């Protein structure tokens, strides 16, 4: 007879009658989605984790990662003690001695204090997927170092920059597809775990309502597996497809003319006088002394009825979108939309077929389908609103065609212009911030570009002084660049220089290489938080590991001092001079702030917190607390009172009492402000704010009035509300930039047409002139331009699996059972042509390196592409795993064939493998060949490295490993 009891009873059946059962709410951090969770404890131990049904983001849904968070606590990779490298030991040998936190703080305070007193840029702080950039950026600014960035530069900065410089918002935290009302979704280059639970919920509802889902991706896994249509595409050719779609929509007359005229710069007249320093700029009837961060309404249309130029948005005007005209002084002009039409004429579906591999007829059909739905199936909601020109509207009209895209589109050296093309495609269909289209999430939309600016020269970095500007910003023209008098970079990673002018997230992937090369200057101390830069978060991993341990002729490390803060032993911690043990997300206070990357919904701002459900293990300390402590010891202005005394007791006290300016009422958290918690978004500090968040599911959700929820780029009510609550500086319209005058300003500088302003160094002028095109264009990824495509005929990709987040989870005993090691997925036709068997050993090789791995046949990948999971392969002994674990013996890391730099140019200059506009790392540009491994070769993945030793404080006992599998079970006597 079958046993009827459940397969798994988390609380067990034989409970001690005195057992203390409690449930606590907090926010997950098993990926960047940040769902609400409920953690059940028995006698202080975690028993199981559930989704919180009262949380607006995931509504109770939880994924495999989230439910396995309990394993974080029992991982044998947990770091529990501050560690100092033993004298005489080499980096990478993991030879450490335990020290106290007081010793660790003394070491940091002494070293960083000397740096700040002499040359603050000698300290560099780079952080991974930490979700606390408001704090880390504040620390860097007050320290006075420009050398700060988070992981965005090697993740998806092209997505952020390409969209924000075009529509004032972007996908992911700041916007997304309105699948509640959309009828057609086109998803491009999105990993199968992206925005995990909320996107799964939305897709499920969308499909049940009859929506059509089309996936454009070289690989059909994850979300693509449930798509109604999979359109396989060659990696790095997305821009060609998007430009061909724009061409076809214009050819078929399916663009939304009224929307473009009213809400974009499509009808604005562009100066075409090649001899003018204003060539390519919009014609203005007056020039205000400072345009600030918004588009002043001082440009011109050519009116159809009057047949002459008039001010934009003149009541009753009907401007041309097409045509060529001359001003009274003879200046030739065209509407920006005409320039777009001229540009895309060459980008036909037939042309795109030869580049993308997508049949021309498919491209035509896709364009027709999205254009017809956007035009003929509009949605009208009875929501009255007023635009910024004073026009009152009785309803909101939507075009129910939506898009979603992420890193697969962004992580190419041509990604910025591809994403500009995507943004323009969305715009000409009339889908920006409308029902069924793309919708913003607070604090966006913001002006184009947003207002924060970096320093502009070396004089803005001074000893014992906060940075004069923000560490990261949004340049509007060449004068905003952070360069010296010769036009050379001031930042270590060369962000905001002529090499990468719009590197709005920095270039973390360049930090170690540049510090090792001492280019543009040597640094003293590099602090890496929560980033595995000696393994999966770096390109050409073996060389970077060598750089970290490299010494000069005097026997001194080329990177003199390296601090690593992390919760787990990793490939990176072994190289540290000082290791700081961080807590897990279940052991600390944390906030997803409106000042950073909140979890807002379409209907209004949402922020959230983490509340500790467990005490820290061993001597772990939250990195936030470390920054508060060091900032206080160094007497950084934001962390001390005027008399130099400590201002904040700890991190929770800092979050409660910090204001962006004295009396501003704007802090890290928007909920329950005011002395009694009666105010929202803006108000005095509330001493019980954390307590109120804890009582309210650790989340604050402010629902905007219905009249503020759409058309926010031009919604007067919303913009005034956003200005009042410091989410935008101006309550001015944020028109869509079909034509980017910002890019044209950089191009003019490269052409010598920036009188009295900055010009790029000679070696970079052609580069700037080429890539800073005000209209999107297609070019091959830079690596493809430099590769022998006959020798390396294939593209290679990595993506995150649904059950693991980068390198975080191979030490997670439950998730290991889903992904223990990875294969290289190859189309059977491609593999068989190379005589490679399914499950057989093979080599994958690029001009940068080669890897031996296992092959897995897959029909779900286009024949010209091979791919694998990211970061499943581990170095032997890392992450508390057995040295012979499958992760290191069979698993592999594709990064070994990806270069962080391209071959030097004729002048011997090093060129980063990055987008020339933003510095986005070109992860998916690598070209490879594959071939069968010799049958006599040992059956092990290559390359291999020396076995990494466990670090002091790690519990790698058999008991610990047993707990790692059976955590959550009932206690045994």
Regions found by a protein language model. Give the residues of each.
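Glycine/threonine-rich phosphate-binding loop and adjacent beta-strand/alpha-helix elements that clamp
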Residues: 176, 586-616, 626, 903-905
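Glycine-rich phosphate/diphosphate-binding loops that line cofactor/substrate pockets in enzymes
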Residues: 105-121, 175-183, 343, 366-383, ...
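Flexible loop/turn segments at secondary-structure boundaries
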Residues: 34-37, 47, 56, 131-135, ...
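N-terminal leader/propeptide and maturation segments of large enzyme subunits in energy/redox metabolism
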Residues: 85-103, 254-365, 464-493, 610-760, ...
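N-terminal export/assembly segments and adjacent metallocofactor-ligating motifs
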Residues: 1-316, 524, 529-531, 630, ...
